[in-house]
A protein has these predicted regions:
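Residues that flank catalytic or metal-binding motifs in active/ligand-binding sites
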Residues: 69, 97-98, 158, 172-174
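Conserved hydrophobic/aromatic beta-strand scaffold that supports enzyme active sites
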Residues: 13-15, 161-165, 218-220
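Double-stranded beta-helix
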Residues: 156, 169-222
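Short, solvent-exposed loop/turn segments at secondary-structure junctions
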Residues: 20-22, 102-104, 108, 150, ...
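Non-heme Fe(II)-dependent double-stranded beta-helix
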Residues: 1-10, 17-145
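Active-site rim elements
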Residues: 69-75, 148-150, 210-221
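Short, conserved beta-strand element in jelly-roll/cupin
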Residues: 146, 153-171
Length: 222
């Protein structure tokens, strides 16, 4: 644990591999998989979106349209290693502000009329285009580097995000991409000032274009 805490302090990122009960993880994953027809059928029609556009409150919240809250996640939340790590980093009185399922939407699911729009305007969160009854999970289709404090702009930066992969994730399955040590700059305005190098392990990031610094990119696959 000491090594994990040191890594987190140094890089802002830490990975725990093979920590959870795989059977319990897959049981939840399979139940989610069978919950609905994961296809173009979860999307609203173009006519409906134009007539009734929705840009806010289209994602699950705490106690609000949240499929993840229907599951017993004690094997995650009460895992001794996880609890110890969170106690050491956040303090003994930490609380879970929000837990939700995040779904990576493949191109095959996106209706043809919507593909051009989401590509042109780099729309990552598809909640506003999803039928209301299916908005109990968050739907992402690629997303720029960002800090999760963007969802709580008036909050203190005393929070962390924990991602749990319920199934194996490879580089073609929208894995989490992080920038190691970028936390040392603290909260910065989105969209962030980043000069990416597509075929390089590093990118340039800073609070202004005059103060860009070199940071290492990391892709989290399992």
């Amino acid at each position: 644990m000491k090594e994990k805490l040191q890594t987190f302090k140094k890089t802002g990122v830490v990975v725990f591999e093979n920590l959870l009960d795989k059977n319990k993880s897959l049981k939840i994953f399979n139940k989610v998989l069978k919950n609905r027809n994961w296809s173009k059928k979860i999307f609203r029609t173009k006519k409906e979106v134009i007539k009734y556009p929705q840009y806010t409150k289209t994602n699950p919240g705490k106690g609000i349209c949240n499929y993840a809250e229907e599951f017993n996640l004690d094997f995650i939340e009460k895992n001794k290693t996880i609890q110890t790590f969170l106690n050491k980093t956040l303090g003994d009185e930490y609380e879970i502000v929000l837990k939700k399922f995040v779904v990576a939407v493949p191109d095959a699911w996106v209706p043809n009329w919507l593909k051009e729009k989401v590509n042109k305007f780099l729309i990552a969160n598809l909640g506003g285009y999803i039928k209301k009854k299916f908005r109990d999970v968050t739907y992402f289709r690629g997303i720029d580097y960002h800090q999760d404090i963007i969802d709580n702009p008036n909050a203190k930066p005393d929070m962390l995000t924990m991602y749990v992969y319920l199934n194996d994730v490879d580089k073609n399955m929208s894995p989490l991409n992080v920038i190691e040590k970028s936390h040392i700059l603290g909260p910065t305005v989105f969209p962030h000032i980043i000069k990416d190098n597509i075929n390089n392990e590093f990118l340039m990031y800073g609070k202004s274009r005059k103060t860009l610094r070199k940071f290492k990119k990391k892709q989290l696959i399992s």
